[in-house]
C-alpha cells in the first residue's frame, strides 16, 4: 500500500528491523531503491541469494514475490514474466494477477496476460489497480 502511494520513507521506518522475512525484506528493498538508501545493494544481494536458494530446493511458494523483485529491482521483465506466469498456474489472487500484468506490460508481451484477463472476466473481480494495468496492457491507458 505505502509503496503504491509513493510513501517509501514510511516503509523504511516500519521495516528497517524486519529483514528476516523475505516478503518484508522485498518491500524494504523496494523502498530503499526508491530513496537511494545505502543498504539497498546489501538487501538486493540478500534477496537474490535467498530466491536462488529457494529455487535450488525446488521451493516455488514465493514466485510472485520473486517476480516483483526480478521486475522492479533487477530490471529483468522477461524473467519476471516467466516467474509470474509460473506462479499464476498455482496461485490466483489479485496480487498474483498484478504480477502477471505488470510483467507482461514491461516485457511487451500482452498475450502472456490472457489467462489473467480471462480470470478477471470470469470472476468479475473489481480492482481499480488491476483495471488500470489492463488499460495499459490493452492500449487504453498510459503507465
Where are these regions (language model features)?
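Terminal, low-structured helical/coil segments at or just beyond the last alpha-helical repeat
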Residues: 53, 57-76, 112-143
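Structural motif corresponding to the intra-repeat A-B loop/turn of tetratricopeptide repeats
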Residues: 5, 35-37, 71-74, 107, ...
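Residue-level signature for tetratricopeptide repeat
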Residues: 1, 30-33, 69-70, 102-103, ...
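Generic helix N-cap/helix-start motif at coil->alpha-helix transitions
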Residues: 19-28, 57-65, 91-98, 124-131
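Alpha-helical tetratricopeptide repeat
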Residues: 26, 48, 52, 60-71, ...
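Repeat-solenoid scaffold signature
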Residues: 1-34
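A C-terminal functional module that forms or caps the active site or interfaces directly
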Residues: 97-100, 105
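Alpha-helical repeat scaffolds
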Residues: 6-18, 38-53, 76-87, 111-122, ...
Amino acid at each position: 500500500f505505502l509503496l503504491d502511494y509513493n510513501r517509501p520513507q514510511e516503509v523504511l521506518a516500519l521495516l528497517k528491523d524486519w529483514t528476516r522475512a523475505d516478503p518484508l525484506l522485498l518491500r524494504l528493498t523496494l523502498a530503499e531503491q526508491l530513496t537511494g538508501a545505502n543498504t539497498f545493494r546489501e538487501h538486493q544481494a540478500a534477496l537474490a541469494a535467498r530466491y536462488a536458494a529457494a529455487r535450488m530446493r525446488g521451493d516455488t511458494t514465493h514466485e510472485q514475490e520473486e517476480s516483483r523483485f526480478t521486475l522492479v529491482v533487477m530490471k529483468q521483465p522477461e524473467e519476471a514474466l516467466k516467474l509470474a506466469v509460473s506462479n499464476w498456474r498455482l496461485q490466483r489472487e489479485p496480487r498474483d494477477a498484478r504480477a502477471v500484468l505488470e510483467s507482461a506490460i514491461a516485457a511487451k508481451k500482452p498475450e502472456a496476460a490472457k489467462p489473467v484477463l480471462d480470470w478477471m472476466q470470469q470472476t468479475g473481480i473489481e480492482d481499480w489497480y488491476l483495471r488500470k494495468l489492463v488499460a495499459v496492457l490493452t492500449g487504453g491507458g498510459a503507465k
